[in-house]
A protein has these predicted regions:
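Conserved short histidine dyad/triad with adjacent acidic residue
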Residues: 33-63, 83, 93-97
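Well-ordered beta-strand positions
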Residues: 51, 70, 91, 101-102
Length: 120
């Protein structure tokens, strides 16, 4: 086995790493932020850690590809009334529409296959 080239590995700790503010295509920033090591993908695609501040509601969106996430901290209220808590592993099939609200903030490990499409 050959040694790992330092440029082939990135490591960040979610407790002290710098998150990047997520800015929507229309320029709006709602306070959510992303920690993503793969800079070959657009911010928010592929695997990343997603942080929502207390009181934030995401915009309604449709998934263009599957979404999967694990709630690491906090609580997430889905638009259909489902309440997700730390430890919940969630899968949304391609084409699913929803939005989410967090009363006290939350941290998620997320994989999103493709860009989301805004819906009302």
């Amino acid at each position: 086995m050959k040694p790992i080239n330092p440029s082939d590995r990135k490591i960040a700790n979610i407790r002290d790493a710098a998150f990047t503010a997520f800015v929507y295509p229309d320029g709006a920033a709602l306070g959510d932020a992303i920690l993503q090591l793969d800079d070959d993908l657009e911010l928010g695609l592929g695997f990343h850690v997603y942080r929502m501040p207390a009181g934030m509601t995401t915009r309604g969106h449709r998934h263009n590809g599957h979404e999967q996430f694990l709630i690491l901290e906090g609580e997430l209220h889905e638009s259909d009334g489902t309440i997700l808590r730390a430890g919940d592993l969630v899968f949304y099939r391609d084409g699913t529409e929803h939005n989410s609200y967090t009363p006290n903030g939350c941290l998620l490990a997320v994989h999103i296959a493709g860009p989301e499409i805004a819906v009302d």
